[in-house]
Each structure stands twice: as structure tokens, then as C-alpha cells.
Amino acid sequence: MLVKIPRWSLVALVTFGLGLVAPVSLPAAETAVPAISLAGPWRFALDRDDAGFTGQWYAKDLTDKIQLPGILQGQGYGDDVAMDTPWIAALGVRGWQNNKELARFTEPGNVKIPWFAQPAKHYLGVAWYQRDIDIPASWAGKRVELFLERAHWQTMAWVDGKQYNYEDSLVAPHVSDLGALTPGHHQLTIRVDNRLMNNQRVDGHSVSDQLGGTWNGIVGRIELRATSPVWIADAQVFPSVTKKTAVINVTIANDSGQAGSGNLVVNGVNAPVQWDANGGSAQMEVPLGTNAQTWDEFHPTLQHLTVTLKGNTADDSKDVSFGLREISFHEKDLFLNGRLLNLRGTHFADEFPLTGYPATDVDSWKKIIEVCKSYGLNGMRFHSSCPPDAAFEAADELGFYIQAEGPFWDSFGPGSNNSKRLDAETAMIRKFYGNHPSFIMLSPSNESGGAYGPTWAAANYQADPRRLYATSTGNDNALNVATGATYASMPHTNSVPGGGGLLRSNNGGPAWWGGDYGDSLRNVHIPILAHEVGQLCAYPDFDEIKEFTGFLRPSNLEVFRASAAAHGVLDHNKEFSWASGRFQLLSYKLELEANLRTPGLSGFQILDLHDYLGQGTALVGVVDALWHPKSYVTGAEYARFAGPVVPLARLSKRVYLNNEMLESDVELYNFGEKPLVGAVPYWTVVGLDGKAVAQGEWPARDLPIGKNIPLGHVSVDWSKLPAPREYRLVVGIRGTKAENDWNLWVYPTTASVDPQTAGVFETNSWTDAQDYLAKGGKVLYLPPADSLVNSPPLDNVPIFWNRQMNPRESAMSGLWCDIAHPALAEFPTEAYCDLEWTELVKNVRAINVEGAPAALKPIVSAVDDYNRNWKLAVLFEAKVGPGRLMVSAVNFIGSRDTSATQLHRSLLDYMAGDKFQPLLTLTRAQADNIWTGSAADVAAPIGAPPPEIDEGRTPTPAPKT
């Protein structure tokens, strides 16, 4: 008979308090049993034809050698990548080979996939791993289990030719009960099959080649463990913050075949327990002490206890670490330990390019989490994957929140095989990781459909309310906010009854200009996170290629680098990657600030803080794929707008005339450690020299935890300040690190100028321009769009995700400006595309100058898509015959744009003066070729041998920001 110990009796018995443990490394819940490590050399065999089972390879001595923990593809086994490699992926892997420029990378021995970073070797199928084991005499009569911390995918185990159960979890250890093994020598054989199974969608990150997820092997702890015949199978701790107690649910397993009784001991205090022939369960409630500290991101205090079972054929113990914390919600708000919580998370797909498999050591995860925290983030969402225990342990110790997902990218209908798999994997996730305080959210899948989601979420929340449960991550589906879900992650709410609206923007909507997404939440009654915010690309720094020294090869980056060399832009890689990155950063800042300003929105899950190497290569991170910082932003700068305490301005515009006023309300997003008592908010407007030109502060007040906390209003009369100038509005809280800033531009109302007055002939006609140049005149040529060959339109936002997967997306990667050039003297700008440029260049066609001599150096270059790398100009100059030519992709004729008017003035002032002396001379034929030639005719194809690339070349330094 199963015995459940009455809670009241245990409270009477157990009156001790659990000691507090500082946030340092603690044993995981499964480590307190005698164990024999099986790490080291194993015998091995590939089984390409899947003949080993019927051929009884488990009874033979295998002859090849391999190291475990490890994966076979990382140790030279498998096949070289070829054009017919059977990738497990559906999102666009095929088709790129039809691009003639990529022909060189389809040749045998030189296959390089631009779609994702490719493995050194690829293998799908069965492999056999074998070694001898020795059972010590002290294990006589004990139950032995085989523990494989992470295996991919299905495993079967044999000892001395006897088969044990098979496992196929993608989220948890594979544990096989071997029963009682006699002391002495035995042979252990494990069959691992990494082929796609269970009809899963092929792009889920737990199974896909998109990020190298098809490894075959066993990683992490590989152990034999001994227990008594009756043992503790599980111990789950449910803390109560209000009562400062913990309820411990203990599952007792029994291989003895007999009922029995004994004592359950927690830190030396006994309680009676009984079990039947099939096992049993017990529940204890223990006080943690009146001084027990809660766990959160600011104070990740861990509690620690040891549960011991002694009695008839029972002698077992478990160490458990947990946190005193509770997550809850009310309407749209999240609460942690009764305090408002807002999440600032990033996407991660459990990919580790250097090893090819998820890290199982705590230090590796700490490095990643520390990067995230240094950029202001407090959480991580795992896409169609659940990380190993080490990730949760690191997050526990550092104070970091985790949303895990089932290992699927599928839909779940009631009673379907997918739903049964989901239930099985969910049970494993809760069992192995449920005690971790960092584990606050669980979703079944990425962007999943099907009607089972609400049932799944409700059942799991009822069974284990230590975390919140979504019906899916990412779908805009009415089911996401139906009864059962306790939070949702959505890109918009168009399908929600009575809802309707964006929760993110990737093309610069009103929310970026001082607004928010509040209207989209008007009929939502659970916490909502904005799903996969960002997805904005930056041009790569090809020096990153040298960092890939392990399993995944950066074939995609190598292809892009070869393309850049062929199109003559590789020498500008440092400038382009920096300028493109600053443009990307600007857009992330606008989007995340809109999110933080939105009332009732519980946070964001960006895609991504780091680069994503699959699905066409989405270089969407501000750190690279190996979590190294990029040149254009530090964590401290990013955290100014993505951290726990962020001042926010509601700026409806950034470009002003000097007869206008700066008017902006300012508020605070405060999810820091505590309310700010006696806080003094301040504001200042500074010039590029850093000197204040206007400033003020607001009365001291207490600032609570929350968002949309009013600070005050900024008003500045621009007529009293010099123009044209770039200024910066800075808002902060005195005596704290909380500070944020926004660039602003002020132009004179007298900017407009007549080209004729400047002695310049301005025209849209190349024929008329030629005639005027032939007479020695100065020409400002504004080529009409229909005259531009292979000249892509620019945009006010970076590339969304990537153009291999989304070829219709804008190809805009930013601008590189020669800020020392006198043509820009009256147009204040930094070296990248900031907001004074974005509306000016939107839908303007950049000029393809690959038909011009290589010596042509644009004053303003457009940075093209890294898949294509055309040499593009927005502004350039040249001598043509006796005349002098300035070419602008921006058409000033009839334009009323404030920035365009000022740029026009700057160009005409320059052209009217003595400094207008272009260094480049073009013949008439060369100039004609820019408008009439084809880039494909003049640019070296990517299939041609690239110029020698000096990996150690001294980079051109990016301008300081």
C-alpha cells in the first residue's frame, strides 16, 4: 500500500531549519550515489546498413576506437559534406546551388554550404559503442543503473548480450535499470541511432542540421550507479515563500519485489515511511527558518537538503538544491516572490559550434549567461530544445531565468502521437530539472498548432505550479490565451478575440517613434512576452572565421567572404561590419525601448543576442555565434536600453528645424533590485563635444518597481542653439548607473539653396549632364531609378532574418560615410546610418558602381546584403573630361524631407567652393558604363579564384563612437 505521510505529523516531527547556501556550485540532484565513470576510450563500429541488431554485434568485440563523452562526427567518423548529403532540414537548404556565382562551392572536395555552418563530417544512422566494465565486490546485491546524461538519439543497451530497455528522450538523461550485476568483469554495448524518428518536423533544433543538431554520440556524465534494491527515484521540492517552508515529494522505487518500511531522513531528522512491492511515495513539509532568503536574479540564494531512505533493503540518499521562490501572475502581470517581474530574454537553440553538442559543464553555461547579463538581459528562451542540467545549475547560481521547450517544432492534437511524445518529454523535463529555481517557464514547442496546448498547459500547471506554462511559443492563435495557459509568447494578437495588433515591429512603425504596443493587449488577461523580437541582420566581420576551430566549419561565412572579394568590397570589411552593426543596434534600441514603454507587456524574447548560423545564416546578434562581443557595441552600451533600470523618452521625431521645440515626456522602466528612494531624475542635451547646451532635473521622489513611471517633461527651444548640429538627449537618475540617450539633429530653416546660385547644374538627365560636363561645368546628377542597373532599393531598417530565406526582404545593411569629406561638412553625421538618414534613403536605389574603376571610393557607400556584396554608392564624385561630377542616389528635386534639404545644401555649398576637386577621373565611356553596363558583366564571378586573403592584415579602425 502506498503511504503518504500526513503533513501535520511531519511538521510536528521536523522542526529544524535548512541552512542557507550561498550562490556557489552545489551538487546536482542526481550526484549523491556511488558511481563509476565510463569516460575514456571505447570500442566502436559504424553500422551504415543497420545490420548490427540482427547480426548480434552486441555479442561481438568491436574493433574501431572512439572517446566518450564525445560524438563520432567530431572524431573523424562519417562522410565528407557533398552535394547529396542527406541533411535533416527543410527550410531552404536546396536551391542555392542553382546560383552560378556559387558554382565553385558545389565541386567535390570543395562543397561549402552558404545556408548554414556545416559539420566536418556528417552521418545519419546507427553506431555501436562498447567497453568492458568491472563491478566492484561492494556492489553485490545492489541494483545497478546505466546513466547517460545526453545521447542522440535512440539508445539501446546490452550487458553480456542481454538487452535492456531503450531510451529516446531528447531532453533528459537516458537511464537503464540493469538490475543486480554480479561483481566482476562484464561487457557493455550501446547502440545509438541518430536518424530522424517519431515523424518530427525536421527543423526543430533538437534534431536538425540547421545548427548542427544531428550528432551521434553520448556526452556529459556516463556512469554506472549503484543503489539499494529500494531507492529514492525522485525528490521534488515545492517551496512556499509565504510560509517559508518546503514540501518534499519523494518517489520510492522497489526492485526487491517485497513490501517494506523504513525511515525517510532529512538532514538527520527521521520520519516513518512504507512502500509496497511496486514502490511508494511520501510527502514531507519542512520549515526553512524565518531568516530563509528568497531566490531571484539579484539574490540567487540556494537552499540545500539531503534526503535519505533507510529500511528493509533500502539505503539511498539524494542531495537536492532549490530556491525559495514562487512565480505567479495576475491579469497581464508576472510576479516573482510577490514582486512584479519583467523578462528581458534572448533566444538560444542549445547550439555549440566548437563541440557540436550542448555543453554539460557548468562553467560553459556560466560564460554564456554572464554575457547575457552584461548586456542587460535576465533570461533565455530555448527554441525547440531543453538544455542539460548544467545550464539550469549555472542559471540558479547566477540568477537567470529559463524558459525551456519540448524538443519539437510540431503541432499537437488531442490523442495524437505527437501529444503522447510531448507528455513523455514533459514528464522527463519536470523530473530532472523541476527543482531548479531558474526554471520558471515551459512551452511545448516553437510556433506549434493543434488543440492540445491548453489541455497540456492546464494539466501541467495543476501538477507542478512551480513554473508557468504556455500553449506554444510564438503562434498568434486564440488558443494561446485560452483557459489553461498561464502566459503566452506572441508576435501579435490579431487572432485574439477583441485583440488585434503588433507586439513587435521590424519595419519601424509608430511604436518606434515614442509610441508603444499597448492597444494590442486590450483584451488579453494573461502575461504576454513579445516573441522573437528583432531578427535584424548586420554585415559580418570575416575575422570571425578564424574563431571556428572545432566541429562546425563556417562554410557560410567563407562563401560570403569569397563573394566580397570577388565584388571588390573585402578591403572595407571592417568599416562595413562596424557601420552595419551600428545601424542594426539603432533598430534594436528603437524596438526594445518600445517594448519597455508598453503598459501590460511582460517582456521580450529577442532573436537574438548572438548570431544564428542556420536557416540561411541570420547574423542577427550583437555578439557573434561563439558569444564573443562585436566591435560596434559593448555590453554596457546595450544595457542602457535593455537593462533592469532604463529611462525612456517618448520622442515623436528626431530631426528638427531650428524654429521648432524639442518636447518629450520621459518615464522610467524600473525592474532593478529595489525601488529607488529619494531618486533625482535629470536630463541634459549635449553636443558632439560632450558639453551640455541645456539641462535640468526633476524633484526627488521614490520610484517604485514597474514600468511607465513618470519622470517629467523635456522642453528645449532649438532656436537658441547653433544649427546644423547633432545633439544628444541624455536622461538618468543621479547616483545610479541608470542612464539612456538619444541622438537628435537640428537644421536651419534657411537650408534651402538654388543650384544655379551655387553655379551647379542639377539634373535627372544623363544626356544633359554629359553636355554640361563636356563644357567644363559642375554637375549634380540625380539618376532616375529606371536608369540604374542592378541597383537595389534602400530601406530604413536592416535586413530581416536573412535574404536567402526571405529573398523579397530589403537588402539594406547600412551606410558607410566618409565623415571627413567636405561634401558632408554641413550635414552632421557619424559614419553609419542613423535616424537622420533613414527616411532620407528609404526606397532610394543605391547606385551599383561595379562598372566603374576600382579606384572609385564613394563618399557614402551602401552596405549590401552579405549574400551578394555588390559595390554600392549613395554619393560619389569624379572628374569627367573637363567637368566635375557629383552623383547622388537621393533625388532632391521636389523633396520636402528635412534631412534631404540639409544634405542638398551641404553638397551645393561644397560644389560651389574650391574644395570640389574630385580625385578620380572617369572617361566618358567609364561614366556611361555605370548607368548602362551590367554588374554581372564587369564583376568577377564568385566562381573565379579569389585574391589572396591575408588573415593577419591590419584592419582599418572604425571611427570612435
Segments from the language model and where they lie:
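Accessory carbohydrate-binding/adhesion or oligomerization-edge regions at the termini
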Residues: 28-110, 191, 195-198, 907, ...
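Accessory beta-strand-rich segments of carbohydrate-active enzymes
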Residues: 45-47, 79, 95-109, 118-231, ...
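N-terminal carbohydrate-binding accessory modules
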Residues: 236, 306-372, 744
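Short alpha-beta junction capping motif
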Residues: 757-802, 882, 907
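Extended acidic/polar, glycine-enriched regions
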Residues: 180-185, 251-329, 720-752
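Beta-strand-rich binding/interaction modules
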Residues: 157-159, 245-275, 282-284, 305, ...
